[in-house]
Amino acid sequence: MKNVLSIQSHVVYGFAGNKSATFPMQLLGVDVWALNTVQFSNHTQYGKWTGMVIPQEQIREIVTGLDNIEKLQECDALLSGYLGSAEQVDQILFALEQIKLRNPNALYLCDPVMPHPKKICVVANGVREALIEKAIPVADIMTPNLHELRQLTEFPINTFDDVLKAVNALIAKGVKKVLVKHLGSAGKINDPDTFEIIMATPEGVWHLSRPLYQFNFEPVGVGDLIAGTFLANLLNGKSDVEAFEAMNNEVAGVMKTTFELGSYELQTIAARFEILNPSSNYKAEKVA
């Protein structure tokens, strides 16, 4: 069994961060060692919540504890998501350094969660700068959305060609795989009823589209689900393209179930059979 140290947010109610990623990854046969960066009552897009940011020292202590019982050599990947402070970025890098010492083949997937002007997504000051300065140079995989891609590269991105230039800039900095979630108005198809996503590697760029469900309130945690299931499929031995397609069909099933149930929260439990055996078969097209 493959193991992932997943360092991201936790919500008591609902599905975001580790709550969104853990169960689907376990369904796919990958164990998740969940280490929380924050513990909130619910995700921040409700507009009100309670809870706390986990002190950065606690992350280091937990990682050291895993090393003390000689378990870091069993860690196949590090996954990072929502961070509660810029200082936590340093602890992510500490965790990566320790894991790589024990298992040089371990992967690092960085989901660079950043504040969004149209969403109540509260991210601490300095996180963006710390991710750009410290995470990009060491990440094997990054999974930004379109807004986060703009912030990471500081490129103006309005067209599909702009997206390609931006992802190639990240690849040039050493990131081996870049997934850009929900291209929106910068998509290749640019249809409001279509969800578009790309995967870029040094070997090329692949594009995939599927229906975009029109929720009254867009569920949170979809990016966490995408990052987690893509990583799980890679660890299960699938090729880049196979993992990209599998993830998209698994996530499509979760979104379909969530929409049909009229839920604001992702319905990963209700959609468990869609994760295990997706009913859709969307395929990726190489576009560059």
From Swiss-Prot:
Keywords: ATP-binding, Kinase, Magnesium, Nucleotide-binding, Transferase. It is an enzyme of class 2 (transferase). The keyword Membrane does not apply. Substrate binds at S9, T44, Q45, D224. GO terms for molecular function: ATP binding; magnesium ion binding; pyridoxal kinase activity. Its cofactor is Mg(2+). Pathway: Cofactor metabolism; pyridoxal 5'-phosphate salvage; pyridoxal 5'-phosphate from pyridoxal: step 1/1. It catalyses: pyridoxal + ATP = pyridoxal 5'-phosphate + ADP + H(+). GO terms for cellular component: cytosol. One of its GO terms (biological process) is pyridoxal 5'-phosphate salvage. SUPFAM superfamilies: Ribokinase-like (SSF53613). Gene3D superfamilies: 3.40.1190.20. ATP binds at D111, E148, K181. Its EC number is 2.7.1.35. InterPro entries: PM/HMP-P_kinase-1, PyrdxlKinase, Pyridoxal_kinase_PdxY, Ribokinase-like. Pyridoxal kinase involved in the salvage pathway of pyridoxal 5'-phosphate (PLP). Catalyzes the phosphorylation of pyridoxal to PLP. Belongs to the pyridoxine kinase family. PdxY subfamily. Homodimer. This is Pyridoxal kinase PdxY. It comes from Haemophilus influenzae (strain ATCC 51907 / DSM 11121 / KW20 / Rd). The gene is pdxY.
